[in-house]
Amino acid sequence: MMTMKARLGMAFDFKKEYKEFYLPKNTPSIVTVPSMNYIAVRGQGDPNEEDGTYKQAIGLLYGIAFTIKMSKLGDHRIEGYFDYVVPPLEGFWWQNGVAGIDYAHKEAFRWISVIRLPDFVTKADFDWAVEEAARKKKTDFSKVEFLTYDEGLCVQCMHIGPYDDEPDTVERMHRYMEEQGYTLDISDQRLHHEIYLSDARRVAPEKLKTVIRHPIRKG
C-alpha cells in the first residue's frame, strides 16, 4: 500500500515513521520488533581495519541498497514501489565462546552487517538488484544475501558517545531488564544488535548515536 507521504511525493523515512525502533530515548525500554527483511553480508574481524572485510561489506550493502532505490529510473519495475530514504546501517555482533560482547578483542568479532529492505522488495527484486549492481559496478556481489530476521522481544537504548563506551549503556539496559522481570536471551539465533544513526567519518565520537538492542525473555 502506498503511504500518504509517497502519494504527496515525499520520501518515506523509516527512522521517522518507526521511531520506536530507530529513535528510542537514551533510557532503556522494552520493545517487540517484528520480522523484517534485510540486505546482509556476513563476516568476521575488526571493523576498524582499513580496507578490511567489514568496510568492504558496507560497500556491498550500499551498492545493492541504492540499486533498489534508484530502480524507479530504469526498466525494472518493483510492484508497490514508493520513494524512500535508504534506512541506516545496522549490525548483529557476536564472538565464539563469549557471552555477549568483549570489546577488548575486536579481532574476534563475527558479524552480520545489514540494511533494512522496504516490504515491497521481494526476493526476486533483490536477485535482480544483485545482478544489476554486479553488471554496472563490475564488482562481485556474491557475498550479499536476502535475510529475514524476526527479532521479537528486546531491551533497547540510545547510546550517545564512542562505540568503546557501549558497555556502560549495556549495563544500564541489563539492570533495567532485570528490574522489569526479564532475562537476557542472547544465543546463536538472537544476537547483540546495533543501529548506526551517525556517520563515524563525519561525527565526533562523543556525539555518535547508536541504538543498542538485546534479545530478552520473560522470567
Identify the role of each PLM range.
Residues 3-219:
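A solvent-exposed interaction/effector surface
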